[in-house]
């Protein structure tokens, strides 16, 4: 799906040091990382540079909730992530199994990041239809929800829902800056400066070099850049 996927660190290299070096190179103060063993070690080395998220499968309802509670207590977890189309069986955004997870996130003051729109892998994608977020936002007004990976082809609907629901946000993960949806950028430049924020896809599909080479061409207004690159993520993920 991606061209020029970043090369992994050479065998024998320290992936944590390599990642910190890339962050330094592009002026990245803090990154959100999945809670892998390497990410836990990176957080031990430099807690201020590493915030942690946890991917869970809500099919194991109580098991997922216990994992989230433990990660919050032990590792200062900042977000839970959910890939509805990638669960087996699939768990739609508005499924009762996901609702149990959302309730736990409200109790623990955690943001939840959910894939929205057509999935990249060749999976059925109705479970990620953007309209499903409407009911979730209604039922969980305290929940901080972030749509990730595009929300296409329903990006205009995503904007309408962000206008409607205070807790719904959008991050630009999975897309090179030149392909950010126009409807989302237009929204960020007008009524959504506090709702849209940067996310990359390093090292899964995009190099930081490509991302930061293309970012200056994104037509954001001057006052939108600070919320887009820093302030919105710090607020949504409760970063210090």
Regions found by a protein language model. Give the residues of each.
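Conserved residues at the C-terminal ends of beta-strands
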Residues: 34, 83, 199
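A structural motif corresponding to the C-terminal end of an alpha-helix
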Residues: 21-29, 46, 107-108, 139-143
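Mid-to-C-terminal alpha-helical segments outside catalytic/metal-binding sites
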Residues: 1-30, 192-197, 205-240
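Active-site gating/metal-coordination segments in enzymes
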Residues: 29, 37-120, 124-127, 164
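Conserved, mostly hydrophobic/aromatic
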Residues: 23, 71, 105, 149, ...
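Short, acidic/polar
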Residues: 12-22, 60-72, 155
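Short, charged, surface-exposed secondary-structure boundary motifs
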Residues: 61-66, 178-183, 207
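Catalytic pocket-lining loop regions of alpha/beta-barrel enzymes
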Residues: 78-79, 92-197
